[in-house]
Amino acid sequence: VSVITSSHLHDKPLRPEDATNITLTKDSLEAEDNNGRFEIMKPPGAWKDFFDRMLSEKGGGKKRKASNFTTPFNGERYRCILADSSGGQVITMRKLMRSIPRVDKDLGLDWNAIRPLLEGSGLTIFAGQMSSGKSTTMISAIEQLGRKRGNLGTVEDPIEVEFQGGGVIQREVGTHVDSFAEAIRDFVRQYRNTIMVGEIRDPETADAAVLAASLGHSVVGTLHADSAIDIPTRMASLLDPKLARILPSVLRGLWWQHVYRRGDGKSKPLPIYESLYVTNSVRQIIADGPEKLPQLMNEMVSQKRVSMAQSATAWVSKNQATREELRQWLETRGRINDSQLDYVR
């Protein structure tokens, strides 16, 4: 491997095979691993051959339209997007999981904080920004529930990992079903106790998820949001107004997380998270409107749940990170502000 540049010149060079995120062109390969290490190199022979093969197999059709696909390579599975650019064709790749990690031992999260958010029926949202690990946490939590979850239906884009042991229907958007919403409606008719939605990203999916939860199913999905308190706002902005009114009654649990990666090749990723169990008092606050949502912080305190600032502070106190590194989570980041209130009025 010919390294052009590295984010950490004294570390052992990062191999493409060890990267979780890759950007590949005919002349360069950008690699980033789960610890945040980043390097740019010339594509090794096997990767150059892969690039040429994907252009031949997937590069047809309209140049301005990206091609999304999942493919095996070098013993791994990758989620790929092939797209045109001013510099030529580009393939962005994300390595998919081989097996399901454990919530506590592998992800470093508190299972006792997550478990109550998944009990019974209703809607539980795992939120965060891009590359925050929210999907991995959701999948790990569902796996750890085991038989308590009942029979399971999952819809993803793509399927991240296969659940083992039977009692599972897994569907991939674009391969087995046309949309997330269609799969959710099918799962309701197929009597799936638990329905896992890879991403709630459009109104149709949000509406279907809330309807399924209102019918007594356990619905679990991911959503882009800046904090646990931000989740009801983001969810309501997607929903039909009639369904937005019943959102407080079907919500069961809110989980938000981010993963800080130092990028030194030695430090483990540090999870920063906060959560809220949706009690009757929480439902009332959400129902009272966006102006009342900051009161959810008090509910978090009364439930003895960790806020994102407390979670970040714990890593600083353990000398795993500095205050400067985690400053954006130690401050009042992602809380309700005027622009968010205007967005949902």
Please report, for each region that a protein language model flagged, where it lies by residue.
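Short, flexible helix-loop junctions that flank or precede catalytic/ligand sites
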Residues: 1-345
